[in-house]
Amino acid sequence: MKNLAKLVEMKQDKTKISMITAYDFPSAKQAQDANIDMILVGDSLGMTVLGYETTTQVTLEDMIHHGKAVRRGADDTFVVVDLPIGTVGVSDEHDLKNAITLYQETNANALKAEGAHLVNFIKKSTQIGIPIVAHLGLMPQSVGVMGYRLQGSTKDAAEQLIQEAHAVQEAGAVALVLEAIPSDLAGLISEQLDIPVIGIGAGKDTDGQVLVYHDMLNYGVDRYAKFVKQFGDFSVGIDAIKHYDEEVKAGTFPAEAHTYKKKILNEVNSND
């Protein structure tokens, strides 16, 4: 398993870090079998798996349920689990209770928290031994306020992002996700920080990349962000399901090859 020291070493060696989301046992197993460096159990599962419009409806219980499944499928991969909206940013007692619960229940390697306003939470969590991955730029939990658009696109906004990146590192964050920001800004932040910086829609100059499993595989998703590249096409599964439906209705499935050869009725009738 790649630990934090190995991820930092990859950054120092300029070896790109690959990260992908996974939400269940089979997707996690696929990621591990493909030698992905990190898995994110993102609250994006609200949209990709649970059918919500945004991530804001995802609960702590949802993250625990899916986080456990991912860990079972990827027992030798660095797994990060999202802290969903409302679980942190309230009070120290409230925040740490939720973080401890999620960390222990999922057996994650780290938790992810959105926003620079959680600097104190990052510091407190680090002090009790829970590694935190910070998330800046576009923050899906705050789309009701900021919307889905490029962040850090003005001088003031860019300077603020740089300050926030340094602040979360100083607070103890073990890595940083930058989403939907100009590529030159992301490259500068990656260069300035000692911790690994993972980009999504942040250009190629970050220390690594993360994509959503369902986006990159065209799996049940109708709309895609500009930064998504489809590396496969799971939508072909629809054709397979249609074919199955046709064969059931035509009576051609199951065929003899899919049927047990054991005959039992003669034995049953002989008891009469």
Swiss-Prot record:
Subcellular location field: Cytoplasm
Catalytic residues (UniProt): E179 (proton acceptor)
Matches recorded under Pfam families: Pantoate_transf
InterPro entries, per database record: Pantoate_hydroxy_MeTrfase, Pyrv/PenolPyrv_kinase-like_dom, Pyrv_kinase-like_dom_sf
GO terms for biological process, alphabetical: pantothenate biosynthetic process
Catalytic activity: 3-methyl-2-oxobutanoate + (6R)-5,10-methylene-5,6,7,8-tetrahydrofolate + H2O = 2-dehydropantoate + (6S)-5,6,7,8-tetrahydrofolate
Residue numbers binding Mg(2+): D43, D82, E114
Family matches, as SUPFAM superfamilies: Phosphoenolpyruvate/pyruvate domain
Cofactor note: Binds 1 Mg(2+) ion per subunit.
Pathway membership, UniProt: Cofactor biosynthesis; (R)-pantothenate biosynthesis; (R)-pantoate from 3-methyl-2-oxobutanoate: step 1/2
KW Magnesium (keyword) present: yes
Entry cofactors: Mg(2+)
A single MF term (Gene Ontology): magnesium ion binding
Residues bound to 3-methyl-2-oxobutanoate: D43, S44, D82, K112
Enzyme Commission code(s) on record: 2.1.2.11
Keyword Cell membrane in record: no
GO CC annotation terms, alphabetical: cytoplasm
Keyword terms: Cytoplasm, Magnesium, Metal-binding, Pantothenate biosynthesis, Transferase
Record's subunit section: Homodecamer; pentamer of dimers.
NCBIfam families membership: panB, PRK00311.1
Reported function: Catalyzes the reversible reaction in which hydroxymethyl group from 5,10-methylenetetrahydrofolate is transferred onto alpha-ketoisovalerate to form ketopantoate.
Cited HAMAP family: PanB
Family: Belongs to the PanB family.
Protein name in UniProt: 3-methyl-2-oxobutanoate hydroxymethyltransferase
Organism name: Staphylococcus haemolyticus (strain JCSC1435)
Organismal lineage: Bacteria, Bacillati, Bacillota, Bacilli, Bacillales
Gene name of the encoded protein: panB
